[in-house]
Amino acid sequence: MMKKIIFTLLFAVIGINGAFAQFEKGKYYLGATTNSAGLSYSKDSKFRLNLGVNGGYMFEDAWLAITEVGFDYRNSDMQQFYAGAKCRYLIEQNGLFLQAGAKYIHGAKSFNDVQLTPEVGYCFFFNRHLTVEPSLYYDLSLSDFSDRSEFGLKVGLAWYFNNN
């Protein structure tokens, strides 16, 4: 019995050390996100389809610079395209991440907005490269704070890799 416990602890330590390697300087990041499950709230809470694509680079250990582009369909009158940049800090000990950024939104009826985008989430690593990243976000609208700001839950799928 003691042998099983020791081997289990040994494999857990090896697995934890391997998980930290994902946060090394020089890694690249590709991801896709959605918050289409209706798990967000704003004054304009109707049907919604949101898809985003992200790419990034780990410029220091645990620090990731990310660019994003995406599409947000809210109803037949409001489709939005967005582009933004974010900086993410990955907490190596537990997989949590803190992220902040900004995005520019262009909507159908000549609607333009800039939003600040703080976010907190978790990286569930399936292996050394593939993650599922649920996160809580708040999109703070600078043009219409009361009607366009929203908070919610989004889920991402990401791939961390080296360029060699």
What are these regions (language model features)?
Residues 26-28, 45-49, 77-83, 112-116, ...:
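Residues that define the transmembrane beta-barrel architecture of outer-membrane proteins
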